[in-house]
Amino acid sequence: MAQTDFGKFNSLKVKGMVNMHKLIILRGNSGSGKTTIAKELQQAFGSNTMLISQDVIRRDMLRVKDGENTIALPLMEELMRYGRKNSEIVILEGILNSEWYFRLFELAV
């Protein structure tokens, strides 16, 4: 995947949104580029940007399978809460099946 120019997204910081916390959710099929885009966005936005990656939590940290009652969900919820309190921008990325992760999306509102 080619390097993407996310410079225009940095303008969000100077157009009256400086003190607003933001949540970016990237969902999609496996191999669609979610993680690549999420990492590029985090780099473009710079410090105080938190990236929550479903695969990192589920596969790397907890080593559990995805599913309706995955133990990854409570940790992701806690990370979302932490990010809302402590980061200007939170990026959540993963396949994030809406039937299994609806509680996580409820935290976004």
What is the role of each PLM region?
Residues 20-23, 87-88:
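Pre-Walker A (Motif I) flank of P-loop NTPase domains
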Residues 5-19:
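Short, Lys/Arg-enriched N-terminal segments with co-localized hydrophobic residues
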Residues 32:
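ATP-binding Walker
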Residues 35:
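Walker A/P-loop
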